[in-house]
Amino acid sequence: MAIAAVDANDRVHQLILLTERLTDLIAKQAVAFETHRPHQAAQYVEETSKLANLYRHESMRVRANVGLVESARLELRQRLMRATEAFDAVLARQSRAVEAAKIVTEGLVHAIAQEVASQRAAPATTYGAGGMVNDRPQHGAAITLNRKA
């Protein structure tokens, strides 16, 4: 999918709309992560993915052929630059929010793994027939932590 523009002004206007919509979606995802509600970000994934691919494709086209936009009105090009700056800022914000969520998740997994390991290492005693203390048989079970998950 590509932008079908009649001239440079139309192309820049469409790029502005694309950039602003993508910025809005990514900002909503960032808010979801910042408020510890990553499940709410999921509703934007499909549209964000489609628009991000279109944005990437159109950015490459413009970089390869600046003539596609250089004859557009100055105020439109300036508006596109501002929209792109806002987009970059939101991407940085989302990156920080996702990294924070990742750190929290990794911490939880690590804490759970430590608790499981400590439970398994605790003396295992039970009461058997006649009220005698029996050593509980140790059952081997593995837990794997992948630091690159």
UniProtKB/Swiss-Prot annotation:
GO terms for cellular component: bacterial-type flagellum basal body. Its main location: other. It comes from the Bacteria. It is found in: Bacterial flagellum basal body. This is Flagellar basal-body protein FlbY. Keywords: Bacterial flagellum. The basal body constitutes a major portion of the flagellar organelle and consists of five rings (E,L,P,S, and M) mounted on a central rod. The lineage of its organism: Bacteria, Pseudomonadati, Pseudomonadota, Alphaproteobacteria, Caulobacterales.
